[in-house]
């Protein structure tokens, strides 16, 4: 189980690829991976961005040894090699197939948590799955790395020069800070996710 391996600090590229190879069966349309951002998420696990910032200057890490190693691994996913990735460019007009995932033909699908609310929970209700039928796990750690590295999302809010609504801008920033820092607000938001969007204590 990937989550058990993660909790033990053993969820690595090699363990993930081992599972992927066991699961994948192209002749029966079974593929280990699907999703839009699979490549970027795996590259992030190297701990090196493709373009970095050093001493205030942009630098290319495209020739970094770990990124090259990751690219070599990703190349094996292709339909011309080990076929570990669902060939969405051939089968589904470049779109991930959530139906294939729901039918048990995809082992790992990379996506955002909001996709659960939009799509996956509906499959769960329709198929009457138990709470533990759907689970999330971080991307695996690069073998030999010192820790787990993941992509991050950063939001930025800019105040437009000449704007006449400075108070509204301040209120918006404050509301965002409050919702992300206040424990009571976070607890209420979590409960709303459970009540309205079918999240549960295991997700």
Q: Where would I find each of the regions flagged by the language model?
A:
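Loop/turn elements at helix/coil->beta-strand transitions in domains of secreted/extracellular proteins
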Residues: 24-31, 82, 103-107, 129-135, ...
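Extracytoplasmic/periplasmic substrate-recognition and gating elements
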Residues: 123-194
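Glycine-centered hinge/linker elements that transmit conformational signals in sensory
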Residues: 13, 17-22, 53-92
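Extracytoplasmic/periplasmic solute-binding protein
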Residues: 9-60
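Short helices/loops that flank or line small-molecule/ion binding pockets
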Residues: 17-22, 94-109
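Beta->alpha turn/N-cap motifs
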Residues: 36-38, 111-120
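Stable alpha-helical elements in mature extracytoplasmic
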Residues: 12-19, 38-39, 67-74, 97, ...
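Short, solvent-exposed loop/beta-turn-alpha elements that line the ligand-binding surface or hinge
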Residues: 5-8, 49-69, 126, 141-148
